[in-house]
Amino acid sequence: VQNSLAYLKEKGAVWLVSRGHMGTYIEKLDYRRLQECGMNKGLLGSMPLPYSVSYQGLATALYRVLDNFEFNLVYTRGSESRLQLVAEGVYQFTVCSLYAAEKAMKNRTDIEIAGNLGLGSYLSRHVLLLRDIGAEGIQEGMRVAYDRTSLDQRDITDMITSGIRGIRFVELRAHQTVNAIRGGMIDAGVWNMDEIIESGYQGLHIIPLDDLVDVSKFSTAALVIRRGEESLKQLLQRYVKTSEIRKIQEDIKKGRIPVDY
């Protein structure tokens, strides 16, 4: 311990003050220097493309709370691929839905959840969009949007179409759902309400999914790391506080602070 403290002091990562018989206390820490001493590379996280205000707020919040560190975010589609890259050590952590994190952990033991950012931190909610304004839900013979690259959209779609005969899945990216419905390519599709509101889409037949699917875990953001990275886990739990992340997200939504990611 003494050798480690001496090394950190020499590197300018820690300042110590002696208080006689009371011992030696840490007076100041330089977290960026500590990171350089304790990690062989900068802190690199990943999350979905910031196409919605919720994601933009989340990205801004992460940069703010981790400002003392050499930190960068990579934006990429597909929670499954992001989780795999965390397991391989390419990213130190990723942000995905709590549903995606828990589902992945049922089939693998090399990742773990380091933080839960609370309901609504990932997105407000998923909804069902229908082309027929008279329809009350998905019916036999409908053409339904299906995005194999989006675990959340794919699994919600599987849940709400289970047992319905004659469904024809039309493969397309989830973000193309609205245009596909308006263009007559599909009859139904699952998409998130944030994007619908923020894009100002009008005249859509929207059905809430709360009565059909437990959407809470799809709306909750989770921080996932490689299992066994205890120092990283403690760092994230100390600095990425749910209350602070949510406040920054809300400030972004209300226009109180600028987006910065």
Across the structure, where does each feature detected by a protein language model lie?
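C-terminal regulatory
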Residues: 139-177
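Short helix-initiation/N-cap motifs at beta->coil->alpha
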Residues: 73-85, 168-182
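Periplasmic-binding protein-like
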Residues: 30-31, 114-132, 202-238, 258-259
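Active-site regions of enzymes building and remodeling cell-envelope glycoconjugates
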Residues: 69, 110-113, 163-169, 202-209
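Conserved hydrophobic residue
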Residues: 14-16, 91, 186
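Mid-protein regulatory/catalytic core that forms ligand/cofactor-binding pockets
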Residues: 45-155
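A ligand-binding cleft/hinge motif common to bilobed small-molecule-binding domains
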Residues: 95-108, 179-209
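N-terminal hydrophobic or amphipathic helices and topogenic motifs
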Residues: 1-81, 215-217, 228-261
